[in-house]
Amino acid sequence: MVNIAGGATEGYFYPSDMQALNVPFYAIRGHLSTLITLGHEALAARAPGVSFMQVFPGAVRTPLFDQTPGVFGVLVRCFVAVAPRWLFVPIEESGERNLFFATSGAYPAREGNGKSGVQVVEGVDIARCVDGNTGSGVYSMDYDGTEAGQKIVDLLKQYREEGMVQRVWEHAQEVFGRITSLD
């Protein structure tokens, strides 16, 4: 399962504000990326035959830039118009990379003997997961497939030890329960 969001950008997590209603603007990306990754860990524990990955797509030139309203939108469009092409990942290339992530055997689920996905060829290694091991089923990657660094692995280990995976799962269950309630 590929989630296009903020892979390899995990950061400080605010467990008392999981919805990020009061998280400082500068910390939102790290908080939400961590929330997603911890959620993936909770899902992987319940579905060990599925691999979960969060990928940061990089700056992809899309129509979203054209639809940004107001003064900020004008500034964004001016920047995009004059920005060098090398600042952006072409949309086709982004799609190709994410298709690779979704189908490659380099990102196996926790269970399944590494037999899922397209068989890796010589020279392609099994990716390192967010727990620091290979093949444990939860991945966080930058746009080019670079795995989350050791600092992020250590941070997520700390959150795991503090019981945050379970807290994120309970929060998600509470939110889904509230949304689907007939009351």
Where are each of the predicted segments found?
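SDR active-site strand-loop-helix element
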Residues: 1-12, 55-58
